[in-house]
């Protein structure tokens, strides 16, 4: 009989400016945990346009910063960022670009991954941001998966959520459909991770 610890953890890695992407991460973690699998939520520090450091190594509050070891040892990955001119934030991109050692080792090959985002408007670049976050995951050899239309909330949502990934339109709290889509996405990554591990 396999225990929860046998399956490792799903890393939910995000950057959030105003808390919206963090809220998505928390809902995704509920979906992961519903499969008796650990959801490990991590964030990345804000980067600055000036040379001196503006962030300490340990955040003052909230989720702790992700390390390369967190990324290396995950059984599956969810990556989230607010939309910045139709692409991911510089802070998240900076962290992902520091993972070349894992690319050389093939540490993330054949692990499932998904993406999520938040924007200030419905046509604020959500889909292009989701696609931009998929690119480094594909280079790492990960198995990128979105949300199928068998998830009913995907056809009903009037705000965020797409087959490319979970999302939110800012201006109010997450809608019930957005929450359902996040949970379904987290659950799907966890189920795929368990299934792939059982094949090894």
Identify what each model region corresponds to.
Residues 1-105, 168-200:
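N-terminal beta1-alpha1-beta2 submodule of the flavodoxin-like/Rossmannoid cofactor-binding fold
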Residues 20, 77, 81, 87, ...:
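Gly/Ser/Thr-rich helix-start
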Residues 54-56, 155-167:
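Short, flexible, mixed-charge acidic loops at enzyme active sites
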Residues 97-100, 104, 121, 139, ...:
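Alpha-helix boundary/capping detector
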Residues 105, 127, 133, 163-164, ...:
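Short, charged/polar low-complexity linear motifs in solvent-exposed/disordered segments
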Residues 109-158:
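Short, glycine-/small-residue-rich phosphate/pyrophosphate-handling segment
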């Amino acid at each position: 009989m396999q225990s929860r610890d046998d399956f490792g953890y799903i890393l939910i890695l995000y950057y959030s400016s105003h808390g919206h992407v963090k809220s998505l991460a928390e809902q995704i973690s509920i979906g992961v945990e519903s499969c008796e699998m650990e959801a490990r939520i991590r964030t990345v520090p804000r980067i600055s346009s000036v040379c001196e450091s503006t962030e300490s190594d340990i955040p003052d509050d909230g989720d702790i910063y992700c390390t390369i070891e967190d990324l290396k040892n995950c059984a599956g990955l969810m990556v989230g960022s607010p939309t910045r001119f139709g692409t991911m934030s510089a802070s998240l991109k900076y962290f992902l670009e520091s993972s070349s050692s894992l690319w050389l080792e093939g540490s993330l090959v054949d692990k499932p991954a998904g993406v999520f985002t938040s924007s200030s408007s419905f046509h604020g670049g959500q889909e292009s941001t989701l696609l931009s976050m998929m690119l480094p995951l594909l280079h790492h050899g990960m198995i990128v998966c979105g949300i199928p239309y068998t998830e009913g909330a995907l056809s009903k949502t009037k705000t965020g959520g797409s087959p490319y990934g979970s999302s939110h339109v800012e201006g109010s709290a997450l809608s019930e459909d957005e929450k359902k889509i996040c949970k379904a996405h987290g659950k799907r990554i966890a189920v795929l991770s368990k299934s792939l591990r059982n094949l090894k």
